[in-house]
Amino acid sequence: MLYFIVNEKSKSGNAKQIWKEIEEVLKVRNVSYQAFVSEYRGHAGKLAAEICAMDDNDICLVAVGGDGTANEVINGITDFEKVRFGVIPTGSANDLARGLLLSKDPKNGAIHILNAMKKSREDTWCMDLGEVNFGEEKRLFAISAGIGLDALVCKKALKSTIKDILNKIRLGKLTYLVLTVQSLFTMQTADAEIFFDREEGLQKKRMIFTAAMNFKAEGGGVPMAPAASACDGKLSFCEAAGIPKWRTFLCLPFLVAAKHTSIHGFSVTDAKDCTIRLSRPMVVHADGEYCGEVTEVHFHCLPGKLRVLK
């Protein structure tokens, strides 16, 4: 059975009209489906859990919304064996859809999902997921998770008027760039000890950020880990540490152009697991969703966890 979880408020409310266009495609093709509207933060995850509890062994579950909605839905899935997941992007960043090379046109996206449903479960493409553990809590992520600057930007974006303004003039992707510049010079860094795949710890002074990447890009298309793959059983960890903030600022154009990996102070490491211990609390995020502030965090990869309709 085909189920939709729709966030009509994404992209400053434009998603409501987009959902109407998707429904037209479904009606023309006489497709049987059920749709549920996410009404508040966290609701999409609850809806996903309720759908998973239904007596249905082949659930095709589609998130209509931004990256945050998709993350909620994925975290709400209670049985990955009977779920095939799809996404029709209506957000401002849409990094998951970009990483999956999905159509930007919602009607084409719906048609593509309907065609993908014709494949058997065994032939459906599988992607890795990441899991971040912080304190007594944990959260799955499809795109990225991280601590420091990128997480601080995600926290600010949740309540930013800049994001709403830029979305209205169709420049929502710039939100993260504007907030990055704004946050860089005011944030506090932390010294860190990093353990990749449980090996000996690496000492990092004045860490600005560490991003655990499943796909190449986050934050509206910034290629933090240009060689990352969502089906290699590993995460790519992009770090910036031990360099002045002003130099980090000057390196931002290289970061956007995916030319940062050879610059002093930046590094990218592929690993299945990573534990980071910090000298002071730093903000942590998962797929742009604020998760709090921590002094220790653990990331690990869940290979082939999610079947994707693509």
Give the label of every model feature segment.
Residues 8, 64-66, 88-90:
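Glycine-rich beta-strand-to-loop/alpha-helix junction loops that act as flexible
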